[in-house]
């Protein structure tokens, strides 16, 4: 941030030290959340009041954030993990929200986290019930959901504009012979959560029986990494895409290729020999597929074509006993 330009005030006459307040709130949220969820010893570094162009020229509160170094292996083990990215992004958002609300003397409310424990079940010949559980945010008590939005997709179409519901379940008519899919978002006065996984159901004509599809693939993660055993731990380390590429959230556009330089002592020499961490560049223009959380519809279409009706649920709904497997016939 920078406080001296334009005689120390913004265009509306407010003090440029508001940039310091914005910086402090964002940094405080990031450090607190990382220490709580990942690394209790995470270092909180200083704030700089310096004349960087990006901080000096804007006539609104501004801050520059440098969190991780791409040349630091320990940093990048966090930096390419989609779960860590979400935590930090949400912390930045919370800091901005707290700053804006403080300017207008308003209580802030953080948008909820996505719901989980989702399940679909047949409750009649052509009716289904979708249920789920709210996820409370242990880092932010204001993020509790108040309502939910259920989005519906018929066949291969797109999702509709959603139906607002007040409770943790939703009943609807299920047309025969077509796959219907559902996702849920949580809602409060702070906004709308990220969407849930997508569940699907289908009612077959002259159904031979009912099949339960358990959506077990809910993983997102960074790729496999290693540090050589001591005393070679200072010599070799890196990421092993061939062992485990990791799973992006939805998709990834930052991946350029697998790592090829694992020697920690090798310095940067030029862009074609960039030292420890050097990667191939054969994926620079590619979009890498991630977890879409939209798989029951794929299996359900085949099940429906075979003459069986189907419903689906999340794996945590089975683990918690919300869905009882004995309700379904084993063949």
Predicted regions and their residues:
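A short, glycine/acidic-enriched catalytic loop
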Residues: 1-15
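Active-site-adjacent substrate-binding region
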Residues: 15-49
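Active-site-adjacent mobile loop/cap segments within catalytic or ligand-binding domains
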Residues: 38-105
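Pro/Thr/Ser/Gly-rich low-complexity, intrinsically disordered linker/stalk tracts
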Residues: 98-143, 176, 190-209
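Beta-strand signatures of extracellular beta-sandwich domains
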Residues: 147-151
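Short beta-strand segments within Ig-like beta-sandwich modules, predominantly Fibronectin type-III
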Residues: 160-167
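Beta-strand-rich modules
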Residues: 171-193
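Aromatic-Pro/Gly-enriched surface loop or interdomain linker
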Residues: 197-329
């Amino acid at each position: 941030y920078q406080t001296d330009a334009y005689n120390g005030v913004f265009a509306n006459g407010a003090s440029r030290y508001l940039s310091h307040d914005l910086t402090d709130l964002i940094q405080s949220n990031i450090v607190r959340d990382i220490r709580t969820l990942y690394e209790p010893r995470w270092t909180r570094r200083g704030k700089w009041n310096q004349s960087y162009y990006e901080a000096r020229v804007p006539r609104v509160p501004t801050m520059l954030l440098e969190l991780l170094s791409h040349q630091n292996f320990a940093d990048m083990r966090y930096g390419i993990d989609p779960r860590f990215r979400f935590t930090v992004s949400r912390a930045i958002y919370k800091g901005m929200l707290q700053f804006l609300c403080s300017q207008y003397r308003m209580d802030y409310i953080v948008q909820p986290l996505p719901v989980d424990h989702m399940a679909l079940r047949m409750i009649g010949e052509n009716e289904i019930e979708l249920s789920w559980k709210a996820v409370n945010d242990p880092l932010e008590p204001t993020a509790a959901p108040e309502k939910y939005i259920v989005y519906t997709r018929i066949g291969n179409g797109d999702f509709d504009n959603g139906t607002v519901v007040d409770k943790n379940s939703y009943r609807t008519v299920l047309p025969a012979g077509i796959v219907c899919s559902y996702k849920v978002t949580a809602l409060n006065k702070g906004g709308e959560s990220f969407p849930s996984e997508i569940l699907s159901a289908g009612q077959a004509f002259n159904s031979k029986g009912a099949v339960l599809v358990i959506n077990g693939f809910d993983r997102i993660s960074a790729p496999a990494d290693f540090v050589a055993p001591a005393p070679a731990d200072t010599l070799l380390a890196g990421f092993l895409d061939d062992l485990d590429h990791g799973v992006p959230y939805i998709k990834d556009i930052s991946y350029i290729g697998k790592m090829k330089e694992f020697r920690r002592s090798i310095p940067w020499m030029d862009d074609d020999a960039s030292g420890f961490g050097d990667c191939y560049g054969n994926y620079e223009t590619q979009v890498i597929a991630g977890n879409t959380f939209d798989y029951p519809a794929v299996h359900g279409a085949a099940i429906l074509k075979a003459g069986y009706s189907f419903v689906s649920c999340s794996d945590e709904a089975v683990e918690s006993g919300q869905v009882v497997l004995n309700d379904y016939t084993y063949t």
